[in-house]
Amino acid sequence: MAADIGSQSSGSLEERFEQSLHLQNVDKQDWSLNSVLQFLKLYKFNKEWEDVFIKSRIEMDLFINLADQSKAEEFAFKNKLSKESAIQLSSCIRKTLLAPSSTRVPSKNSSYETLTYSAKDSSDDVFTETNSGFRSSNQNSSLKSFQSVPDSNVNVFGGFGGSVVDNNELLSTGKNSHQTTSLNLEGSPINLHAYKGTVTSIINDDSRNINKKTLSKQPVSEHKEKQTSFLRRFRVPGFSRDKDKTKDCPSSNSNPFHLASSNVKTLDASLDQGEWVPRIHRLESQIGLISKKKSFVLATMDDMKFTVVDITNVQNATQLRKLIAKSMYLDISIDQFDLFLTEVGGAQYIEILDDRKLDIARLYSDEFGTIKFFVKPSQNEESGMDSDTYLSFGTKSSSTYKADDDSIYHRKEDFKKQPSYPVLTSDFEITDAGPNLSLSGHQPDNKYYKGFSSAPNLAVVPELPSRRFRGFEKIRGAKGEMATKILDATEAQSEKNKFTVCRPHKKVTLKMPLNSGSSAPQSPSSNTSASVLTRNFVAHRDPPPPPTETSSLRRKNTLTRRPSIRHARSSPYIDTGHNEASKFSHTSFDPKASSKSSNSLKESVEALSEIPFEDAPALDESDLSGDPFWAIQPKQSSSQVPKENHHNIQSKLSINTEAATDLKANELSSPKTPEYCRGDDRSISLSPLSYRLRKSKHIRESPPSSKVINSGNWEVRPSADDLYEDVDRFFPRYDLDKVLVVDQSRMVSSPSKVSIRPKMKSVRLLAREASEARKEIRHNARRNKSGNLLRRSSTKLWGSRIVELKPDTTITSGSVVSQNATFKWMKGELIGNGTYGKVFLAMNINTGELIAVKQVEIPQTINGRHDQLRKDIVDSINAEISMIADLDHLNIVQYLGFEKTETDISIFLEYVSGGSIGRCLRNYGPFEEQLVRFVSRQVLYGLSYLHSKGIIHRDLKADNLLIDFDGVCKISDFGISKHSDNVYDNDANLSMQGSIFWMAPEVIHNDHQGYSAKVDVWSLGCVVLEMLAGRRPWSTDEAIQAMFKLGTEKKAPPIPSELVSQVSPEAIQFLNACFTVNADVRPTAEELLNHPFMKCDEEFNFKDTNLYDMLCKRKS
């Protein structure tokens, strides 16, 4: 045994110790010094070993490590003990630790192997590793090899714990004791002596089932006398010592599971071998470990949100069903829903659990909630269930919801523990954990909902996520009845329309009451279930009939006058008016004039375009109550306008489309431009403004403008204005006209108008509005004669749900980005590289802000080296995120949030135009001294702020300093930064990190005393020298030479002789102060701000420097 186990790596062996100890509920703390001494006495080790153990305090981990033969021999050699006794000690420790395990949970590095016995091995110390643990494999070995192990019975189900059982005690009926009859039981991976599928535990009896030859050498009485309470502590709790007890193991051919003794209750008498067992994964790793006190199951209706149900006192399936319904607040009888077994993420819901199967599944429950039930309306009740009862599924309410005239459905009882908000996602899915949308004044009385004036209105109610199993079944190849359900007409419609219905087999159209002034008849059902929506129903109003020759163009005005131009879908009939005092009436139409509809429509539009709009009255929101409409117009209405009308409308409104090359110069020349408030940006093809946008887009397909740099040449990052102006070039993978966001400026604030769907606008228009806002801020700053532009902080994303909008996502008319729910962003072109990842341009499509995202890819390869690399990367990113979350300073790159996925980690930062100081030096050359003072002062402000927050940057250099077109310098890249409680005290835990040429001497060689934040001051001196000289410090030395001069000779970077005569004495004094070798004397960042070199000329203007001209030239 010593030879075999000694050949194994110590790491692998220690892992098996951990597994064995874990299975037996044995803590390393049990191996106190007293227990170790008791162990030595038990195995009759001499007094010398006891003295050495007491002197060296060998206990706990130190004692367990001696199970490694090489470590035991090394310990014996060090303490002048015999090598043979060390080998014996190692063998005894391994027996004690490994032998008691009768089952072992498979880890990621091991799998179930077959229990083997090698008859040719004659050594007493040879063990064979199996899925059942570590057992002696020598059938002829004497009791010497296991004399300290008490007799016990064998684990049958794989979940019972017990002590080691020698192979001589496992005898098969009618077989020789030197032979092993191995039978793979159905549902059990453990090979034991068995016959006809029934496992029989062979018990250690003093006068039975023990090899006579072995007994002659070592009496059993002597074996029992050596049993002590010391070894009994390693038995698994709940271990049964009943003699000759035969147990039947229920099994399944497809997926075996084993019951723990502490979990097994009285099974039904009809449960024979081969009966049904729950098909739940990962169950076998949770059973047979400890005796539990309570039993829990999880219940869900969407495989994402689970409810914990305590079934400790449940005795039968009926009680279980009632308890699940009560826990999920389902006010229905137990006959109205079915239960299925499920897992997180979903499963195939094919097998309904009847009472017998449910009772069996109940027996498999544990304190970990391994058993999970999926609750689904029963097939018999589903078709006959009314809409209100069906909508009660998935909601936490003590009663069903009743829809009234003003709402679709509303909450009757709020969540008491966890608040949940309705989220409008890209595929129009409501991810609400429980409470329904509150509409028409039914506001929830909940402190978490304060600040929301009303809930958003939806055109359709989506299908519950719990019913989205059709695609999963198709992929897995469903057959029979399930395949028939998948391929029926109802299922086939889901391929064309993602909008789903709450009632699967009955369509209920939306009916809304009209006001008294409407000519439409009042529907008798308009007052009942008015807002129950259907699966294939697209909400809209019917198009108006064609006008007659005598019909007037005047009708009820619903347009809104706003100060800025908004773009939305136009209508063939544009509402007009002459004065605010004029009264409007509905246009009357003659249905007999259908033959002249096209000509009349053309004339109406032409005449309309000449009517002024200054005197149009403002929108009276009270008029909307009797004139319901939807944001999406029917497709057939667009065909009523001839194509030539586009040119007529455009020409009448005097839009200069021929000069649309420059988007900024091409503004509407007439203040009479109407605002198409009733339309939608998803289809703006009929509006004059859309024609202008289409033409400008067509012109942009020509060679790119000189104002935008090549996307592959990022020497200078373009300004935000240039990015907004040519947003298609920097986000080429997206169709910006189809990505929609909610227009916050038009959100309905009145609770009585929540049935009106919010207006939408495209990301292209959102970007344009953001650009106009920036120009307005700049204009106001110049008008107020402000020296610097007002700083505008980016939107913080910490704590919010952040989702990347993939370019290959199918974007439909319902793909809307909600402003109040999640932050969605689009990834643009690559703009740089960081310490661990790449930096991309991005846009927050909720707000239109341009941001930068640093993405770090997590290695997915499974091996030890990559696992450590993965851990190092994740730890580094987590440390960076924790440090920078609260930083907010003008001279620090602002961190906005982060998003973690299985493949990468994204950190969101503010977008800084321009470029790094290092790149500017390589392209431009040395900076003027006044410019160096200007930049250095800003860096010192940023460093002083970082040090006040307890952060040491440790990688300050020119490449990590960004400067924008306004001359603002920002410190970036906190990948190796470190937090310290006292930044100016030496921290011995800090390792050598940073770039060699910018390192301080104490970083390289500090005699284990560590260093402080003053290393950043040294690095600042290197940056100042770099800006003045135009090249890096130690420019004439290699990295090894620089390390030797810094660490051994304690020298500072040399100042070029030609530079001394070109710069002022203050600059030389500043460099000498930064390059003070003694860190205790070196000044702090706060002190350096008072240095004479930090005083800038009051007349200095960054835009008058050659660097600014170079940046603008590179940009263009």
Curated annotation (Swiss-Prot):
Keyword Oxidoreductase among record annotations: no
Residues noted as binding ATP in the record, renumbered to the chain: I831, G832, N833, G834, T835, Y836, G837, K838, V839, K854
Record field: compositional bias (Polar residues): 634-647
Molecular function terms, GO-annotated: ATP binding; MAP kinase kinase kinase activity; protein serine kinase activity; protein serine/threonine kinase activity
Catalytic activity: L-seryl-[protein] + ATP = O-phospho-L-seryl-[protein] + ADP + H(+); L-threonyl-[protein] + ATP = O-phospho-L-threonyl-[protein] + ADP + H(+)
Function: May regulate cell morphology, cell wall integrity, salt resistance, cell cycle reentry from stationary-phase arrest, and filamentous growth in response to stress. Activates the MAP kinase kinase skh1/pek1 by phosphorylation.
UniProt family annotation: Belongs to the protein kinase superfamily. STE Ser/Thr protein kinase family. MAP kinase kinase kinase subfamily.
Protein name: MAP kinase kinase kinase mkh1
